[in-house]
Amino acid sequence: MQRQSWQIVVMVAAQGLALAGPVRGQADAGLTKMLVESYDLLEAGKLAEAQKIYEQILQQDPGNPLALNNLGAIKVKENRFPEALAYLSQALDRAQGYKLKVNRVCDMQGLCLAFRPLEAVYGNQDLAPLVQLNLSLVKAKLAEEKK
């Protein structure tokens, strides 16, 4: 009887997970290492080197929302706001359900935040609200410049 109860619990749990859909996070430890390395370059002001790594990440994991967000932050630092907006919009489209553990945050001119993941594959922070904040700040800056 107890064995049957455990089977039912396992089946119910499996169905619940299937209905919830997959929890997306950093794809693997190799990508996480690249995300950490590129963030460190970004924070050190080596934007071209950081951008190159983010582009490599996107070749391996097209649409990676953290890479797209941080590319948007680079474009903010370069005062290329329309490009930043494009990257952030792409990031937001893909950020729903993407979880990470943020280790550090880099402020780009008070307009955009870049995020350094903890060296772990999954986390508990939803990326979407963070990207939405960046998108709102860049849109406000563009609107201000048009005045």
Where are these regions (language model features)?
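Canonical tetratricopeptide repeat
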Residues: 70, 104-105, 134
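Helix-start (N-cap) detector for alpha-helical repeat units in TPR-like alpha-solenoids
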Residues: 30-31, 65-66, 99
